[in-house]
Amino acid sequence: MANVFDYPKEQLAELIAKTSAELLAAETAKDAVPVIKKALEKYTIFDLQRIGGNIRREVEVLPEPYRSRYRPYSQDLLTQYHAFLADVRSGKAATGAILDRELWDEFWGRAEESSFSEEVSKNAPEAGLGNPAGKFFYRLVYGYAMLIAGLPGHPVGMPFPGGWKVLEENGEILCPIRDKEKDLPQALCNYCPAIQDERCL
């Protein structure tokens, strides 16, 4: 089984296009979950090690004390990946309606363009930067987490420079950077169910 990170550009583009088309055709979460699972299972243990290594390197270059505060949240991408597969295997994965059809269609309609785009979000983990395979992995994991499970792209408690963090108040997830990347259409923040924490503007 070849590593997705080693796919030739044409093969990776074909995977992204085929997966995205199937997800655009999905009518419910029950339809979408097997498609996401199939695509994620193409990533080998070596791909996952590369993603994890990139995340660890990203953390180590951060200045203290922010580095120590951020480190416990830095593996959220892989945590969400493992949680998704565990939910699928146990039959607990979401099966209902897709939460926002318009957002879903936009998200997967942009998948190939965003994966191969050289523009990057300053808030994306290193795993999603520079390599289309990493960007697509990131999109698959958070496509389920945000647009089906309704989870925020950054976990509650995650700190940001300046002392701000993602908070949960009165049943709402408040994020200090939710609306700060609207000029980057491929930024996953634009699809997050969290709302902008107005105190951070």
Region roles according to the model:
Residues 14-201:
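Cysteine-centered metal-binding/redox modules
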Residues 1-8:
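Extended, solvent-exposed polar beta/coil surface segments
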